[in-house]
């Protein structure tokens, strides 16, 4: 909100509509698709942030890393970086953008679409000549602490899928 309040034009661009997210029973109205809820939430958030424009690139959500949905040719993860970057670069040029924010190269927590945001955003900024590119990152220690604290609420199957938070996995968590 600060940027808009300081007179900057804020534009939000999303790679997908988040249609692959997990949904708890009763969260959506009968027949309501998740993407529709996500778009409504996005637009409401954009208004709170004072965003002047919201755009969605024409890709579908890739789901979490390692899921079969990662292989869908229409998903953002599978989009050729150059093609997606040109679409974003066109928006950056239209807006005369001075700054672009992207995820870090690990996509925050390793989500394939967030990793792709990093790749596409970095290339788009080059193509558009956008001078400032800032990466949003997450503190590894905070992530590990949160995972430890929340593990007691997971099923055995879910715990088995978690990285080893005491050994080498913890030292290298989020680092390629």
Language-model segments: what does each one mean?
Residues 1-96, 122-127:
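Active-site rim/loop-helix segments in enzyme catalytic domains that contact anionic ligands
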Residues 2, 69-74, 78-176:
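Metal-dependent de-N-acetylase/amidase catalytic core
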